[in-house]
């Protein structure tokens, strides 16, 4: 998946770092530090040297309780800084809620509009439609001055996900191309520390929407509550670790005050890996309950995946009822796809998967024949190989409905390590239907 931002295009299979440049006197952690144009530009260039791909310029504080800034004042703070950085070949983002500011900064060279109000203003939508900048659509309950006044949700994850999906759909219907849109769940914006924590632990649910996902937790107050760190300037280490955890769950754009510390943390990012699971031989089960027995076997195998060393189970698709492929004279399959993050190399991981298969009685006497448990590596982040033991990406992934459908369920728009997009267009066999299960 890529994120198109004017003349820039970012491959979101790897983290993209957005450095925060507040040209404000009252931001919650660095207000006044970069208020002059010279100081702001110097700090931006330092962040680029430290690894920032984008510089996010903000001229209005959106901290809880912040007073609004007049548009004229916000323009005076931001436009010349944006122009100076863009003239040096830097991808610049303008962090603003105001259409006049967004328009002026895009004209000055900004390649991203980062709107904390989520493009609720029709005038901002018109600015977005009329340009080719990348767009960051954020969720915020209320306005900065009042957003922390007792925010209430029935289900914070579902409500934020649905809001972001609706806003993205609205932008597309207004004429904005999908590849320009990035989503930001807005940690700490109209959310308690507990609500924000729940949201951040379930980012994989937002990644299922199929847009690049931003994580913007840097120095946020909820981290102060969770870790007992009162001074925002002392939250950089936990901010970096929280950002790393968010990227492992599916975020791809990291907005941060401390670029160097964040870049260092992201070097510990474990590769993602998609694992296909299949079964058409139930080991136990009463007549008529074979499908549930197959699901149970795959569920146990998924549990085994979650126990792999230096690994984390991130997401699992629904189960799919599948017609046999290649060898058609056999029982129907149940299939699924799991997404993991792992520090295990691909060839060693294959050995672990074979051990799980063997645990459930897998035999390999008939090619493409019946199996109690079948685990295949479909795609391993940034890794391409073709040797006697392993070929990656899986050479038959894109022709099989039973791998394409579940993979796209959990990561719409996924692009394989060799650059091949996963789409339904090349599917020719192994037709699959989602199994509807009710709690």
PLM regions: where:
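Extreme N-terminal starter segment of soluble prokaryotic enzymes
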Residues: 1-3, 15-16, 271-274
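Active-site-adjacent loop and "lid" segments of alpha/beta metabolic enzymes
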Residues: 5, 12, 29-38, 42-43, ...
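Catalytic domains of carbohydrate-active enzymes, especially glycoside hydrolases
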Residues: 42-58, 249-250
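Short, charge-patterned binding micro-sites
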Residues: 61-66, 314-341
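Short acidic capping loops at alpha-helix termini that bridge into adjacent secondary structure
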Residues: 177-180
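Short beta-strand-to-loop capping motifs
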Residues: 279, 285, 338-344, 379-382
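Flexible, gly/pro- and Lys/Arg-enriched active-site loops
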Residues: 325-333, 347-350, 354-439
């Amino acid at each position: 998946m890529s994120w198109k931002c004017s003349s820039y295009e970012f491959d979101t299979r790897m983290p993209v770092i957005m450095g925060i440049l507040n040209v404000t006197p009252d931001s919650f952690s660095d207000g006044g530090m970069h208020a002059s144009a010279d100081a702001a530009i110097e700090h931006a260039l330092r962040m680029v040297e430290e690894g920032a791909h984008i510089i996010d310029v903000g001229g209005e504080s959106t901290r809880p309780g912040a007073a609004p800034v007049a548009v004229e004042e916000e323009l005076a703070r931001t436009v010349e800084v944006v122009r100076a950085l863009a003239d040096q070949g830097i991808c610049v983002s303008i962090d603003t809620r105001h259409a006049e500011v967004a328009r002026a900064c895009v004209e000055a060279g900004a390649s991203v509009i980062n709107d904390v109000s989520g493009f609720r203003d029709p005038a901002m939508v018109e600015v977005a439609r009329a340009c080719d900048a990348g767009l960051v659509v954020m969720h915020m309950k209320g306005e900065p001055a009042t957003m922390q006044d007792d925010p209430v949700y029935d289900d914070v994850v579902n409500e934020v996900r649905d809001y972001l999906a609706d806003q993205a759909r609205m932008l597309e219907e207004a004429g904005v191309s999908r590849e320009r849109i990035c989503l930001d769940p807005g940690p700490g914006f109209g959310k308690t520390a507990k609500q924000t924590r729940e949201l951040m632990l379930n980012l994989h649910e937002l990644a299922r929407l199929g847009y690049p996902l931003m994580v913007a937790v840097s120095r946020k107050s909820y981290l102060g509550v969770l870790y007992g760190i009162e001074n925002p300037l002392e939250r950089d280490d936990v901010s970096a670790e929280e950002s790393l955890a968010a990227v492992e769950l599916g975020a791809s754009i990291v907005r941060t005050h401390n670029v160097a510390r964040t870049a260092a943390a992201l070097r510990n990012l474990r590769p993602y890996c998609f694992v296909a699971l299949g079964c058409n031989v139930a080991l136990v089960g009463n007549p008529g309950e074979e499908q549930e027995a197959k699901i149970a076997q795959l569920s146990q195998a998924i549990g085994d995946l979650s126990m792999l060393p230096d690994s984390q189970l991130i997401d699992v698709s629904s189960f799919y009822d599948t017609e046999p492929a290649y060898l058609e004279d056999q029982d129907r399959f149940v299939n699924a796809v799991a997404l993991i993050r792992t520090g295990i190399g691909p060839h060693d991981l294959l050995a672990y998967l074979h051990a799980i298969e063997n645990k459930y009685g897998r035999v390999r006497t008939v090619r493409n024949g019946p199996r109690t448990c079948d685990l295949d590596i479909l795609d391993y982040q940034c890794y391409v190989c073709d040797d006697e033991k392993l070929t990656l990406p899986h050479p038959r992934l894109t022709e099989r409905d039973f791998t394409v459908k579940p993979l796209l369920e959990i990561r719409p728009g996924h692009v394989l390590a060799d650059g091949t997009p996963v789409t339904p267009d090349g599917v020719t066999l192994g037709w699959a239907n989602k199994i509807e299960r009710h709690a």
